[in-house]
Amino acid sequence: MRYTGLMGTLLTLVNLLQLAGTLRIAAFNIRTFGETKMSNATLSVYFVKILSRYDIAVIQEVRDSHLVAVGKLLDELNRDKPDTYRYVVSEPLGRKSYKEQYLFVYRPDQVSILDSYQYDDGCEPCGNDTFSREPAIVKFFSPYTEVQEFAIVPLHAAPTEAVSEIDALYDVYLDVWQKWGLEDIMFMGDFNAGCSYVTSSQWSSIRLRTSPIFQWLIPDSADTTVTSTHCAYDRIVVAGALLQAAVVPNSAVPFDFQAEYGLSNQLAEAISDHYPVEVTLRKI
């Protein structure tokens, strides 16, 4: 028994050391995240529990133009230790009255923000813009990872325009490269990249998929939905030799918080209809 206990302790220490030696990044579509959800004590506990797993988390479907819910979320994330997390948030995005924001929360002791910008996808009033919610792009610096500078490009694609919007991320890649001279770019979010929104015959028309520049880390067979559907809507795609080499093999997965925390269907779906998708990067 003593031997078994010692081995268990050693395995735990090894796991902790492995975790400490990585940077964990996630994208999480929290369905209709705003004041109502954040005011629910039960839901807020799970938002904090889930997001605390990550060094960087990109939250989509944020509907909080006055940042009341965002402020409460950061207060809870920083409750035990001030300045554990900081945030940067996009302007409200959308073609009509319905707007969403992209929210990045990150640990300042692990990464810092070097720059950011809103991708210009054309004239919205003219009707020739590309995205329903154009990406808000952030360049991070981490002194501890094998790749020290990298950009994250989030996308919450409109379901009926998923094919064209995912394809247009190739143009975003070129724009980031031209602006910053940076090839190490991570695209992540709810692409609606599966089931009826992107069929098997449509992948050949998506440059982000057909170009050898990009590695798709979440496979088509994955299920990133909380409900009874089985769809790989949420994805992580990486470009750049340094970033691709820094990815820990097999670390890109959906995080099934329902199974992890033993939640009922009702509670899990109240949190969101999507699981986060996550990936880890090696530290030096």
Swiss-Prot record:
One term under GO cellular component: nuclear envelope
UniProt entry tagged with the keyword Oxidoreductase: no
Active site: 100, 156
Uppermost EC category: hydrolase
One record GO biological process: DNA catabolic process
Needed co-factor(s): Ca(2+); Mg(2+)
Pfam families documented for this protein: Exo_endo_phos
Record SUPFAM superfamilies: DNase I-like (SSF56219)
Disruption phenotype: Mice develop symptoms of the autoimmune disease systemic lupus erythematosus, characterized by high titers of anti-nuclear autoantibodies (ANA) directed against nucleosomes and double-stranded DNA, the deposition of immune complexes in glomeruli and full-blown glomerulonephritis. Mice lacking both Dnase1 and Dnase1l3 show vascular occlusions following bacterial infection: defects are caused by the formation of intravascular neutrophil extracellular traps (NETs) clots that obstruct blood vessels and cause organ damage.
Function recorded in the entry: Serum endocuclease secreted into body fluids by a wide variety of exocrine and endocrine organs. Expressed by non-hematopoietic tissues and preferentially cleaves protein-free DNA. Among other functions, seems to be involved in cell death by apoptosis. Binds specifically to G-actin and blocks actin polymerization. Together with DNASE1L3, plays a key role in degrading neutrophil extracellular traps (NETs). NETs are mainly composed of DNA fibers and are released by neutrophils to bind pathogens during inflammation.
Record's protein name: Deoxyribonuclease-1
Organism name: Mus musculus
Taxonomic lineage from the root: Eukaryota, Metazoa, Chordata, Craniata, Vertebrata
Gene: Dnase1
